[in-house]
Every structure is written in C-alpha cells, then in structure tokens.
C-alpha cells in the first residue's frame, strides 16, 4: 500500500515514486515528486 500524506515518514511508502518530506520533524508529512 502507499499513501499521499502521513504524520511520519517512518516506513511510509509514497505513491507514484514520490518522496516523503516533513515540514517539521514527525509532523505534516507529504509525498512529493522528486
């Protein structure tokens, strides 16, 4: 399974070969294009 947004990048697989990035450590994480 994959996701488009999450609260943490730990063990998060992003859809469409995107990279998980957080605005702050452990919060507001989103999957963005590389």
UniProtKB/Swiss-Prot annotation:
Write the record's keywords in alphabetical order, separated by commas: Disulfide bond, Knottin, Secreted
- Entry's family note: Belongs to the neurotoxin 02 (plectoxin) family.
Cross-referenced Gene3D superfamilies, in alphabetical order? 4.10.40.10
Where is the protein situated, by its record's location annotation? Secreted
Q: Name one Pfam family in it.
A: Toxin_9
**Primary location class:** secreted
Say which species the protein is native to.
Phoneutria reidyi
InterPro entries per the UniProt record, alphabetical: Spidertoxin (IPR004169)
Which cysteines are cross-linked by disulfides?
Answer: 2-15, 9-20, 14-31, 22-29
Present the record's domain note: The presence of a 'disulfide through disulfide knot' structurally defines this protein as a knottin.
Please state what the protein is called.
U10-ctenitoxin-Pr1a
The uppermost taxa in this organism's lineage are: Eukaryota, Metazoa, Ecdysozoa, Arthropoda, Chelicerata
The lineage's top-level taxon is Eukaryota
The protein's GO terms of the molecular function aspect are: ion channel inhibitor activity
Extract one GO cellular component term from the record.
Answer: extracellular region
Q: Does the keyword Ligase apply?
A: no
Tissue expression profile of the protein: Expressed by the venom gland.
What role does it play? Non-toxic to mice and insects.
């Amino acid at each position: 399974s994959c996701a488009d947004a999450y609260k943490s990048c730990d063990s998060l697989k992003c859809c469409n070969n995107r990279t998980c990035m957080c605005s702050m450590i452990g919060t507001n994480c989103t999957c963005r294009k590389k």
